[in-house]
A protein has these predicted regions:
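Aromatic-rich, lipid-facing transmembrane alpha helices and their immediate juxtamembrane interface loops
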Residues: 1-286
Length: 286
């Protein structure tokens, strides 16, 4: 792609804007809309993905991601598979069938970051990739994606009531089936993308070490969100989940921060160490 330096600069700016908007909402009680903050993350993933896979490749990622995630979310709302029994409230705005329109872009933005981090840890998937890499990258990326939801779902559902787990769950009102469903859903669309790249992807591409570092930093910025939320929390009130179980917001926010530090931030640190250890040529060749 042309103008790589310009795009690299734009990506750093987007990461900074995302961090500033997200953290300011919590620290200073601002009211920057969720959609606006999510748009920044979407643009970051879109540009970052296009630099590696070109516009056609990242477009394929988006289509696969949106179709698979919407089908499985709607299926679960209707049947309980694969996430469990839940429903969305009207807090997130208009819906596509039974799922808010904002959910698809969230899958894309965070799913791409998980994919990008996994390629740092395992290797990139391209036309000449081995079968091992083709399956290992989406498998590991699915864990990286679920790490995000571990530090997000109890806050969004039990406290903010964006969606309701109708039978509650042991993890602050969230059931284990939610995380198994997340893993399954993310693995399906990332595996389909990996197979697409194996057939239609380009040959090896030279990218700077800083390119990979941007995805690691953005993933860490997202991971810091529950930590900042915990530090900004000023109240500790009782809330109930969909089954009537009572939880305390202080316990939820502290637990989310603890979990995220030792999952997402650990994964980001591991990827950063991997980048620093790799010879320059090996990092550039993906």
């Amino acid at each position: 792609m042309r103008n790589t330096r310009v795009l690299t600069g734009i990506l750093w700016v987007l990461a900074g804007v995302y961090a500033a908007a997200t953290y300011s909402n919590m620290l200073f009680a601002l009211s920057i809309p969720i959609g606006a903050v999510l748009l920044v993350a979407v643009v970051f993933s879109l540009i970052h993905g296009a630099m590696r896979y070109h516009w056609s490749g990242i477009a394929a990622f988006i289509v696969i991601c949106l179709v698979v995630s919407n089908i499985l979310e709607n299926t679960s709302i209707l049947t309980g598979f694969p996430f469990g029994h839940y429903h969305y409230t009207d807090s997130l705005g208009p819906k596509l069938f039974l799922v808010p329109l904002l959910i698809g872009p969230a899958y894309f933005a965070n799913g791409y970051l998980a994919w990008a981090l996994s390629t740092v840890l395992v290797g990139d998937v391209r036309r000449e990739s081995s079968a091992f890499t083709t399956f290992a990258v989406p498998f590991m990326a699915s864990f990286l994606m679920v790490m995000w939801d571990l530090g997000f779902d109890p806050q969004a559902s039990t406290i903010q009531r964006f969606w309701i787990w109708e039978q509650g769950g042991g993890y602050f009102g969230v059931p284990l089936t939610n995380y198994l469903g997340w893993f399954f859903t993310v693995y399906v669309f990332l595996q389909l993308f990996a197979l697409f790249l194996r057939v239609r992807g380009a040959q090896s591409l030279t990218l700077a070490r800083s390119y990979h570092a941007q995805a690691v930093v953005m993933y860490a910025v997202v991971g810091l969100t529950p930590v900042v939320g915990y530090l900004a929390a000023k109240t500790n009130t009782a809330v109930s989940d969909g089954a009537g179980g009572v939880w305390h917001t202080g316990s939820i926010t502290e637990s989310m921060a603890t979990v995220t530090i030792f999952t997402m931030l650990f994964a980001a640190a591991l990827a950063a160490v991997k980048l620093l250890q790799e010879p320059t040529a090996a990092v550039h060749k993906v």
